[in-house]
C-alpha cells in the first residue's frame, strides 16, 4: 500500500527520485501513465496487470471506453529506477502533468501519483476547503 507525501526535484534530464518507501512497494519495474487531474499515475506491475484485465472488459462499441483506453495506454511506459533511485519521466508525461523543477509524489492506496508542486498545492487547498462536503458525499462508502 502506498501512502505519504514526498517533495523532490526533477533534474534537467527529466529524472526524478522515487522515495525509497515507494521503490520497495513498486518493485524493480513499474508502469507510469497519464493520470486524472493532470498528474502521473504509477502502478506496480501486479496492479497494472489487474487494471489491464478491467480495461479489457470495457465495451469497444462505446466511444468513451475506446477514448479512455487509448488515452491511458498511449502514454504508458515501463520504468526501472537507476542505482540512485531515479526514473526518467518521458516528455509526454512531463507535459501532461506540467512538471517543472519541484514535484510532489504521493501514495494513493494501490498507486503513486506524481504532481507538479504548483498543481498539487492548488488541488490540496481546494480539497481541504471542501473536505467536509467531500466526506459527506462519501457516506455511502461507510468509513
UniProtKB/Swiss-Prot annotation:
Domain SpoVT-AbrB: 5-47, 76-119
UniProt main location, coarse: cytoplasm
Transmembrane spans: none
GO cellular component, one term: cytoplasm
Gene Ontology terms, MF aspect: DNA-binding transcription factor activity; transcription cis-regulatory region binding
Compartments in which it is found: Cytoplasm, Nucleoid
InterPro entries: MraZ, MraZ_C, MraZ_dom, MraZ_N, MraZ_sf, SpoVT-AbrB_dom, SpoVT-AbrB_sf
Keywords for this protein: Cytoplasm, DNA-binding, Repeat, Transcription, Transcription regulation
CDD domains for the chain: MraZ_C, MraZ_N
A GO biological-process term: negative regulation of DNA-templated transcription initiation
Subunit structure: Forms oligomers.
Family: Belongs to the MraZ family.
NCBIfam families xref list: division/cell wall cluster transcriptional repressor MraZ
Protein name per its UniProtKB record: Transcriptional regulator MraZ
Gene symbol of the encoding locus: mraZ
